[in-house]
Amino acid sequence: MPSLAAVRRSISVLALAALAGTALGSPAQAQEEPLPVSVTGPDSVNLSLYQDPNGSTEPQIELGLRAPGEPVPDENGVTYPIHTGDYTVTVDASSLAGVAAVDFSALGGWRGCSVDGLVATCPGTEIYAGEDYNRLGGIRLDVTDESAAGDTGSIRVTAAGEGLAFTGHTVDVLVGGPELLNKQLAEPAGFRAGDTFPAPLGFRNVGGLGGDGVLLRVSGTRGLSFPATFGNCWYDPRDPEDLLGRSEALCVFDGEFAGDAAYGLSVPFPVQTAGFALYDAMSYSFTAVPAAQARELLAQGDHQPGTGPALELVRLPEADPAGYSRWAELDIPTKNTFDLDLTGERLRARQGDTVSVDIGFANHGPAWLALLRSGGEPISFAVDLPPGTTATTVPENCRPGWEGSEADYHCFVGTPVLEDDTRTFTFGLRVDEVIRNATGRAYFPYTMPNEGDPANDSGSIVLNPTRKG
């Protein structure tokens, strides 16, 4: 049984790897004999005792080789190996006997590997510069009935081949290390834009082991901000020019937390919503990281420290497991409206004339329209030309109506649409026939739930209007 100190060292390695996502890099070297090649892969894996029914079944460990340089195709687009010759990669997971089940089936690519118990041997013949073309495949680990919190082991990867100098790699495995699920949030009844959401943030450690130190990360899109300045939090407001960027707060908590236990904040975390906010995205997560090491990482960034009282973690006597998940997100507020407005023009023209017609698009607010959940895809409106006319020039973001469409053109408006946005779409129309009061229109062919004034969702385009037209 490993010592508590050894287990905590493993926990620290796992947590920092998950938080910082660091990767080792090697400078390019001139090829020489023997060719130096490194085995690549994660440094550690925290094997969960928590069986998520919706969890991934993909390998947690992806292995590869890294050789000097980068792959460069020739003039025909063909990339050639920098070494050709037999070599063997040996993956030894013997120390995981009784700790975890090991699946080598995704290892070795089309060649596959020969497996003897918990040892896999994989042959190869080519090595390319860099690592993109040197993937070895994946290893899947799963807990068994014998697995227990605190069990440790490792996977040792070595390789050998003539003319090659390999550097091996070791993946440390810890069973049941700290695994923090986040409390799900809900918008309060009657919540409106401009209100402050007192977010009851918290986590549940479903790992069998406790830990020392927690990092809280909170982020929010343009309509959200964090008005408090807690003394153990660091803040990075959104760049005003980055409309789809996020504000972020990072909070560090000292002290130990237990396994199979839930914790909340000593006071709610306030999230201020702007008057234009609508379906803005808030997300947060707790990560097990030693406080001193978290502060070292923060010192390398641009976050500014808070100056108020410190937040604290409070152990909760009871917590419904169903109220916690790996991802915690909330869209707030859901109650607000925008006012999209389409306008046309009234013009006079003779037969054969070509006229410019401006279709105006505006948002009179109060809310912006961002469509954050759909990746900022554009919205569209339809255009029917006045009878007796032909479009000679069409705005860049407009397309002819497709088969089955009733509109002559569809125009696309990129999002986000700000709360005071205005845009103009100019068509060139040739008058083929003079028709009194020839009327077209620009309109939205669908209903928008948060539209505050549907009455101005269409605008008329009138050529040669009569006094009564």
Please name every model-derived segment.
Residues 1-32:
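Secretory targeting and sorting signals
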Residues 31-37, 145, 155-181, 285-342, ...:
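Extracellular/luminal low-complexity Ser/Thr/Pro-rich, glycosylation-prone repeat/linker regions
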Residues 32-34, 82-126, 214-258, 333, ...:
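A surface/secretory-pathway sequence property marking extracellular, secreted
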Residues 41-85, 187-210, 343-375:
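Short beta-strand elements of extracellular/lumenal beta-sandwich folds
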Residues 124-150, 253-282, 290-294, 413-439:
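Low-complexity, intrinsically disordered segments enriched in Ser/Thr together with acidic residues
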Residues 202, 214-216, 236-243, 248-367:
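Acidic, serine/threonine- and glycine-rich low-complexity intrinsically disordered segments
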